[in-house]
């Protein structure tokens, strides 16, 4: 497990965690990020357990929404971040496989000029099923060809970027395929991508990735991303940034729990729960 120096001066950076049924694992992730001086937003994607309650108790602000997939939860978190003035988001999973102590590594790469920083996992093949090893190799090759530059780990959920970047891309994915689309579309738009080696914390959680359906979604994401680029799609104008959020140095005393309601013409409408 790689070590990283404690982060200072993280004003304007919000950690965003899309989460689904992560009650047994999410609290250490939230506390680890807070220890790095990073405020935390958890987007609870329709969990059937106590993910929202556990995350709020650990110090996170929580958005609760109907289940729509990881990609939808990420976009919801980015929209919330922009609306509340956050300049950068650190995206990571809530299952404990990403080490919060490595957050400074991604942040440093972003400050070094990269538009999108991806944490490249040091995967241990002996811990993976054969189909997963083959898929990882094939996916890296296909995304590299589609993006026009080498992308070693297009499936990693540990990322750092301006939230408006994701909102400016013509994304269609709602699940894990969104992360693949982001890599391809960002690279083809001429944005600067960087990959930073990170460790992986293995646990006994059953993967939420469906071997057949999510593999098909991956191939569709690659084809559709290339097609959208050939169709002349370009980055949309970046959304206006709200008044910059103040620096947060500690967890809020009473974390807010917010519901997200679907609305016509918008993917989600934020409303404070009663």
Give the positions of each predicted feature:
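Acidic helix N-cap motif at the loop->helix transition within catalytic regions
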Residues: 24-28, 49-58, 101
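Short, well-formed alpha-helical segments that are part of the catalytic scaffolds
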Residues: 20-35
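Short hydrophobic beta-strand elements that form part
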Residues: 14-18
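Short loop->beta transition adjacent to catalytic acidic/histidine clusters or analogous donor-positioning motifs
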Residues: 12-13, 33-42, 50, 60
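Short beta-strand-to-loop acidic/aromatic patch adjacent to the donor-nucleotide binding site
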Residues: 86-97
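A conserved acidic beta->alpha catalytic loop
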Residues: 44-52, 96
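Hydrophobic helical membrane-anchoring modules
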Residues: 1-9, 123, 146-148, 171-274
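Acceptor/aglycone-binding surface of glycosyltransferases and processive sugar-polymer synthases
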Residues: 66-83, 100-176, 203-223
């Amino acid at each position: 497990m790689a070590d990283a120096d404690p982060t200072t001066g993280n004003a304007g950076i919000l950690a965003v965690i899309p989460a689904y049924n992560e009650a047994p694992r999410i609290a250490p992730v939230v506390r680890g990020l807070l220890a790095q001086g990073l405020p935390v937003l958890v987007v609870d994607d329709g969990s059937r357990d106590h993910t929202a309650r556990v995350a709020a108790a650990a110090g996170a602000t929580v958005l609760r929404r109907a289940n729509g997939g990881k990609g939808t939860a990420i976009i919801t978190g980015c929209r919330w971040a922009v609306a509340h003035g956050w300049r950068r988001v650190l995206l990571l999973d809530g299952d404990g496989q990403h080490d919060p102590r490595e957050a400074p590594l991604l942040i440093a790469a972003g400050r070094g000029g990269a538009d999108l920083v991806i944490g490249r996992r040091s995967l241990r093949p002996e811990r993976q099923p054969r189909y997963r090893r083959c898929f990882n190799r094939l996916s890296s090759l296909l995304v590299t060809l589609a993006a026009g530059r080498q992308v070693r780990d297009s499936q990693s959920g540990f990322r750092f970027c301006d939230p408006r970047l994701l909102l400016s891309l013509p994304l269609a994915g709602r699940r894990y395929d969104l992360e693949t689309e982001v890599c391809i579309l960002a690279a083809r738009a001429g944005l600067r991508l960087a990959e930073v080696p990170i460790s992986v914390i293995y646990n006994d959680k059953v993967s939420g990735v469906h071997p057949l359906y999510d593999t098909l979604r991956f191939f569709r994401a690659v084809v559709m991303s290339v097609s959208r680029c050939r169709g002349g799609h370009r980055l949309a104008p970046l959304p206006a940034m709200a008044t910059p959020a103040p620096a947060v140095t500690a967890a809020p005393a009473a974390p807010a729990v917010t519901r997200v309601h679907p609305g016509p013409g918008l993917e989600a409408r934020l409303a404070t729960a009663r």
